[in-house]
């Protein structure tokens, strides 16, 4: 059964994103479903005594290992893990603005937004105008990024920039040319998504899941 699951970020999260140059990494505003699955897999494997055994020439995978699993409380989880569904995580009550969503060019979401396809008035002229903005001749533009699904206001993900370096463990000094910065999702926010754990008991309130890197 699919369930809506909320995640409270207890630390900054760096996941996916782009490398603007050799020393500046930027996280995406969302958390990929594959990254979330890997976080749950890591949690399971940390409790498994057979985590490094090969199955089909692969190591470190969640899989049912027959009678050796014995009375482990994760048996049903391991049996069904490959069939489970993990959606992307977005800030709670948000989604990406559809391509047909428009907002006032001058005042943004302070004025009512409109969908040019779902609009009640489908005449081309009125459909591409903000009717509350005479001072800007009613011009509208594409909405971009995340929007709150309740208020239709644009949602800005809080970010955190931190500086990191690599250590040479032989000399216990900083490696040359190893200083870099991370632009990550800031801790303290609530992210939400859909997970189908196949009624295996995987989802338990209060679990700590580690996702992303450098955080």
What are these regions (language model features)?
Residues 1-215:
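Conserved active-site/ligand-binding neighborhood in enzyme cores
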């Amino acid at each position: 059964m699919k369930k809506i699951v909320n995640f409270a970020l207890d630390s900054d999260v760096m996941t996916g994103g782009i490398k603007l140059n050799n020393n500046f990494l930027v996280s995406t505003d969302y958390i990929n479903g594959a990254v979330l699955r890997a976080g749950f897999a890591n949690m399971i494997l940390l409790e498994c005594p057979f985590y490094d055994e090969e199955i089909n020439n692969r190591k470190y995978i969640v899989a049912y290992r027959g009678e050796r699993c014995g009375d482990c409380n994760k048996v049903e989880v391991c049996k069904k893990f490959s069939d489970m569904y993990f959606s992307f995580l977005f800030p709670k009550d948000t989604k990406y603005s559809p391509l047909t969503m428009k907002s006032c060019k001058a005042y943004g979401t302070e004025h009512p937004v409109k969908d040019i396809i779902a609009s009640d008035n489908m005449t081309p002229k009125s459909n591409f105008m903000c009717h509350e903005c005479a001072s800007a001749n009613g011009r509208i533009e594409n909405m971009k990024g995340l929007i709150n699904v309740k208020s239709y206001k644009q949602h800005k993900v809080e970010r955190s920039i931190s500086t990191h370096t690599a250590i040479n463990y032989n000399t216990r000094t900083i490696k040359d040319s190893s200083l870099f910065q991370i632009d990550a999702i800031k801790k303290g926010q609530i992210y939400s998504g859909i997970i189908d754990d196949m009624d295996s008991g995987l989802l338990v309130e209060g679990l700590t899941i580690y996702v992303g890197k450098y955080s």
